Amino acid sequence: DHRDLHSFPTRRSSDLPMQKNYVQEILSIIHSGLPKAELAEKLSDYHEKDLADALEALTPAERQSLYSILGVDTVAEIFAYLDDAEPYLKELPSHEAAKVISNMDSDDAVDALEDLDDTDKNEIVNKLDKDSVEDVKMLLSYDEDEIGSRMTTNYISIKNDMTIRQAMSELVKQAGENDNISTLYVVDENEHFYGAIDLKDLIIARAEESLESLIVRSYPYVTDREQVSDCIDRIVDYAERSLPVLNDAGKLVGIITSSDVVELVDDEMGDDYAKLGGLTGKIGRAHV
C-alpha cells in the first residue's frame, strides 16, 4: 500500500506506553542459576536485540556460557545486532567465531567482520563453511561506498520457465534459509535478471496460470558498483521492501532491503536529516 503516510491516523508519542527495557530482566534470568534447558526456554522469549544489549553487562566467562546455552543459530542472530562485534568475536576461538559468522546473513557477517583487523578477519574467513565463504568474500570485495558492499544475498530466486507449482515448491525450499520472501526475483537460464513477482500474487495464482503473467518485467534495480550517494534517493523513492542488485552483465547478485536503506540514509544523510526530510517515512511505507 503506497498511500501517503499522512492519510493514516497517528497517535501522539505522549499517548503511547513507554518502551520497556528488558536488559535487567535478561540479566536476572542469566544470573538465576536455573538449569540450562529452562534458561534457554526463558531467554527465547526475548528479542535478539535485547539479548545483544545485555552482553556488555556480562563477564567473558558468562558470555561463553550463554553462547553454549543458546546455540550458534541464536548467537548469530544476536551478533547481527551488535554495533561493534570485534570484542565479542575476539573472545571466541577463530573456529567458533567462524561458526557464528557462517550462520549470519551475508551482509550482517560482513558488517561484523569489518570491525576486525585484517589478520583476524582473514583467519575467520578462511574457516567459514563453503556455503558462506563465497558470498562473504564477494561482499568484502566491494568498496564501502559501493552498493554491493551494502547488499545481502538473502533472497528468493526462481527461474522464468517454471510453472506456478514449481515456483511454489522452490519458494518453500528456499524460504527456510531466507528471511526476505515478500518479493521473488526471477532469472533466466543464464542467471540474468528477468523480473520480480510479489509473493501474494504467487500464492493466489491458479496452477494453470503461466508464471510469465505474474512477472513484473520492468522492475526497478540498482547495480553493484554504483556509489551509494548516487542512488540512495532513487532507492528511497521506490519505497519497496527490497530492490535487486545487478552486476555489469545484468546478473542478479543480491538485493538491498528496506532495513539496509534505513542504514544507508543514516550513514549518508544523518538520522536527523532523514527524519526532517520524511525519508524514513517513505521507507516505512514498504512494510505497509
Regions found by a protein language model. Name each.
Residues 16-276:
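Hydrophobic packing positions in regular secondary-structure scaffolds
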Residues 279-285:
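Cytosolic juxtamembrane amphipathic/interface segments immediately preceding
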Residues 12-13, 185, 283:
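Compositionally biased non-globular segments, especially hydrophobic aliphatic-rich helices
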Residues 1-13, 287:
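Short, small-residue-biased leader/transition segments that mark boundaries at the very start
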